[in-house]
Amino acid sequence: MRNIICVQNGVARHPDYRMNEPVSLAIGEGEHVAIVGRNGAGKSLLVDMLIGKYPLLMNEVHYDFASSVSSLVSDNIKYISFRDSYGEADGTYYYQQRWHSHDREGIPVVADLLPEAKDEEFKRTLFGLFGMEALLDKPLILLSSGELRKFQLTRTLLARPAVLIMDNPFIGLDAATRDLLKSLLRQLIEATSLQVILVLSKSDDIPDFITHVVPVADRVCGAKVTLEAYLQALPVVPDRLLSPEKEKRILDLPYKEGMHSEQVVCLNRVSIRYGERTILKELDWTVNRGEKWALSGENGAGKSTLLSLVCADNP
């Protein structure tokens, strides 16, 4: 099988960007890989090596994109990193811009930010999968986190890369939107020759279309194994992570002195609207001292908006 990306005993030239052991990893044609490890394990350093971000000592990364019209690594590998619900779509965007209408002047709509398509048929496939037609006239700052994820993927994939690397693709998405994104990625790889590499912190996030897993821990790249072998080797997680005694001690921790109010949060007929869209309408909400709440809702339902009010992060 042809390897599209291959590194043997790779060591970054700069000490700050080195893994703790030389990296040997090959990704074959048709493989879809998950790089899995805890935060700080070295996953991003490994990806930086695979995309040729930093020069290596002696051995370099070898690429084989024989079926591509371009031989450039930058044309064949695209990398998207997501930090939170709103990712990195635009460096000038900030969450409260939604509420400052004067700051929205000149904010582009989705259609303005999509590049020229190299392949019109592929563009139609993408637009159909991601439902982009309905978003084209929508300002970027009005997209929900799920919609923004679709926009970012479409913008990147219009360049027709051979490999798409996504770092933290499911961060900030609710369960339904995570499942939708996994389904869209599966349909995408079934309809095209695209290969996907996902960088994940939790093994629970690995989609079933992944063929192989590369575990990373303590800045060491583990051996690539099949998804089945990786899942079989996972330790069994106990039903309870804390004993009842420890849970009780945590719940019985005293409040700080001075917290005497019975009402911690009190909202009375709160409404928030931007443009023609109403996010919160005449909301009454009281949180009493000692209560523990969970906010639940789909992406775009208004959870972050409500929390911004509670945290006084609003104009």
Labelled PLM ranges:
Residues 152-153:
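Hydrophobic anchor residue at the start of the ABC signature
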Residues 139-147:
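Conserved ABC ATPase signature
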Residues 44-118, 307-315:
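ABC ATPase nucleotide-binding domain signature region
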Residues 1-31, 40, 55-57, 256-282:
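A short, flexible loop at the N-terminus of ABC-type nucleotide-binding domains that lies
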Residues 36-38, 296-298:
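The feature captures the beta-strand-to-loop junction immediately N-terminal to the Walker
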Residues 1-4, 8-9, 18, 90-124, ...:
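Pre-NBD coupling/linker segments of ABC/ABC-like ATPases
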Residues 164-168:
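Catalytic Walker B motif of ABC-type/P-loop ATPase nucleotide-binding domains
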